[in-house]
Amino acid sequence: MQNRTIAAIATAPGAGGIAVVRLSGPESYAVAARVFRPANPNKRVEDAKGYTALFGKFLEGEDAFDEGVALFFRAPHSYTGEDVVELSCHGGSAVARRLVESCIEAGAAPAAPGEYTRRAFLNGKLSLTQAEAVMDIISADGRQGAALANASLSGALAKKIAAEKESLTALQAHLAAWVDFPEEDVPELDEAHLQTVLGGVKDELDTLIQNYDAGAVLREGVDCAIVGRPNAGKSTLLNLLAGFDRAIVTPVAGTTRDVVEQAVRLGDIRLNLFDTAGLRDTEDLIEAEGIRRSWKKLDEAGLVLAVFDGSAPLTREDFELARKCAGRPAIALINKEDKPTQFDVEIIAPYFAMVLPVCCQEEGTRKLISSAVARLLGTNQIDPHAASLSGQRQLAAATRAREAVAGALAAAAGGFGLDAVSVCVDDALDALCDLTGENASEAVINEVFERFCVGK
């Protein structure tokens, strides 16, 4: 499969200034020579050096149908590690598709989803964590999320894991020498040294794991349920955060009967907002179904904005909502602070991570909530240039490694002998190799690259 030369559109679909068709494989230059004629008759595609460009016309047979630029990369100095030619044509979809068809007629094969990055991984140009970062940086729609992905693409995570593996490998070599060659004069490792090395690795893994949720919020966004009694100001809040009138707002209680969805950017976090039906007792079947969905969204959400009417006394529904929010990442918004307060905040405050007095009709509320959400979800503590875990695969591998290191520490402290410590260190090293992809099975590799689209 990897011996074939592949072609695909590498740019996003739709009209644009340019489109890029990428060739990769041993016959890239030969295929390019059949579909591209340099404007300078003294230039030949086959002779082009790496990191050079030629202007010319794109051909279908002998007929020119567009003009543009060919960029040349010689193996191994390319994205995939193979000979690569990138053909930049005008950005109309029809032109780009025709250029791909010409490349296929000239001997290239259609690229599979993620095949370019897969080849980069298999050819040693990227680690598996760097390959995953390619997808993260493509998907990123916030500055911090893009910075985290770029740090991983630049090798921050791979270098961090390599350093921890180096510490464990050196320790394991000493353990193996002492266990396997007891007759030799190998000094036994003292517990203090074991605690220092293993404790240091465990601390680094703990930091990566603890920062995972905040990093995931920056990369992927978070589902946020807006809940509260009728007329507390939920839909007004949704409209404020969205920046336009997304939901109908009236003085009539029960106006919102179904879940209203809207994605918004709050600071550097994408919130998938769900404005829900007002929570109250009702005999209306339609409204009751909306309220059932409100509770369901609260249970599913990664963030809850509970809106209370600060101008009215606390009700049974308010207290029930507060109890439901206990232990969740939830912020109580005491709305209508521009009116005399009748609400007893002290009763509900213990159930929330934060309590904010707000006015959902004032623009300053948006900034206030943005800051509170960043603090609650920990995104304000993230160093966007530091190593970070991305995706459940990396988290699971890091967690296995951390548990194995903790097991080694427990074995050393419990006097179970260096054999037991050595087994745990082996398990930790295996987990770290799984994380970086050194031990990755074909199934794991397939799972990583199936998220990619054609051309990446």
Kindly give the residue locations of the regions a language model identified.
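Inter-motif core of Ras-like GTPase G domains
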Residues: 287-311
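Generic enzyme active-site microenvironment
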Residues: 273, 307, 333
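C-terminal-of-GTPase-core extension/linker across diverse P-loop GTPases
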Residues: 2-9, 13, 143-265, 282, ...
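Short glycine-/small-residue-rich Rossmann-like dinucleotide-binding loops
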Residues: 242, 277-278, 302, 309, ...
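A glycine-rich (often HGG/GG-containing) alpha/beta subdomain
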Residues: 1-147, 151, 155, 331
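Switch I (G2) and immediately adjacent beta-strands of P-loop GTPase domains
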Residues: 55-65, 70-74, 254-282, 300
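Short, Asp-centered acidic motifs that coordinate Mg2+ and/or phosphate
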Residues: 271, 303, 331
